[in-house]
Regions:
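Conserved catalytic core of the tyrosine transesterase superfamily
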Residues: 1-167
């Protein structure tokens, strides 16, 4: 379980995928044979558009350990359900897992959830680069305004950037 959770947590951060896309990944989406690839492309369920993401060394190691431990095949769901009613981990069960992680480190589960994991790396990339277009592509948003709202960029932030930009 710890191996799966580490793989799930790391991939959630790296991929920036929505819960509905993350839980439906198959081994073949992120690996060739037993080798996890450094990049992957997934068709988003919500937008029906492809989104590409990198998979860090740390995440690849966690995923390879999980795939090996769970004896997953190429066509298997990466995070299979333990229930017979479903083939893959449900978004609800994923939310419960995230809530348990959050609670285990004494954070308020009302403040953090599955979307926090999606937003984490995107926010860090934006803070470091201020490149909205890059973050838009990484999140698979169709509109730049969606990315602005998503990151919580306020007028104050925009003015601050403008003041610190030399022409």
């Amino acid at each position: 379980e710890k191996t799966r959770d580490l793989a799930l947590f790391n991939l959630a951060i790296d991929s920036k995928l929505r819960a509905c896309d993350l839980t439906k990944l198959r081994v073949r989406d992120i690996a060739h044979g037993m080798q996890v690839t450094p990049r992957a492309i997934v068709m988003q369920q919500r937008t029906h558009r492809p989104v590409q993401f990198e998979i860090t060394d740390q995440t690849r190691a966690a995923l390879e350990a999980w795939i090996h431990q769970a004896q997953l095949r190429n066509e298997d769901f990466l995070f299979p359900s333990r229930l017979h009613r479903s083939d893959h981990l449900s978004t609800r069960q994923y939310a419960r897992i995230v809530k348990a992680w959050v609670t285990s480190i004494d954070l308020d589960p009302a403040m953090y959830g599955t979307h926090t994991l999606r937003r984490t790396k995107a926010s860090l990339i934006y803070r470091r680069t201020k490149n909205l277009r890059a973050v838009q592509l990484l999140l698979g948003h169709t509109k730049l305004e969606s990315t602005v709202r998503y990151l919580g960029i306020e007028v104050e932030d925009a003015l601050d950037m403008a003041e610190h930009t030399e022409v």
